[in-house]
């Protein structure tokens, strides 16, 4: 199994308590090589202001969000291993984990898994797409040793 090349960017002001780069690498490697041989992904950890600006600009949502996925589209005739960028907002991830009573590490892992599946073309707009994507997320999270991230929503 091939390994994903990770470019980790720490753009948030406070770096304390963030997952280690090796954890991000593990989470990416649990998802992407199943679908794509050679890949490079940028994960950018940001504060609420940058997340808010990007979410407003690209999704029309006037608030910060947990993870944004920007798939890379190579010009025609050019093959590159760049899969895309994940922008993850530290404060939103931490707040959601607290509100949902989930272990913080597990929620970070889920955001990387969720965002990676978006980079690979998965979506959750339609119900059937959401079911497929959530099933994959659950399978990957369980394989990583975490609980089903949707368990409280299914009860």
Swiss-Prot record:
E.C. number(s) listed in UniProt: 3.1.-.-
Main location: cytoplasm
Cofactor binding description: Binds 1 zinc ion.
Domain of life from the UniProt record: Bacteria
Record-linked InterPro entries: MetalPrtase_cat_dom_sf_prd (IPR023091), YbeY (IPR002036), YbeY_CS (IPR020549)
Biological processes annotated in GO: rRNA processing
Keyword Cytoplasm recorded: yes
GO terms, molecular function: metalloendopeptidase activity; RNA endonuclease activity; zinc ion binding
SUPFAM superfamilies attached to this UniProt entry: Metalloproteases ('zincins'), catalytic domain (SSF55486)
Protein location: Cytoplasm
Transmembrane segments: none
Cofactor: Zn(2+)
Gene Ontology CC, one term: cytoplasm
Purpose: Single strand-specific metallo-endoribonuclease involved in late-stage 70S ribosome quality control and in maturation of the 3' terminus of the 16S rRNA.
Listed HAMAP family: Endoribonucl_YbeY
Protein name per Swiss-Prot or TrEMBL: Endoribonuclease YbeY
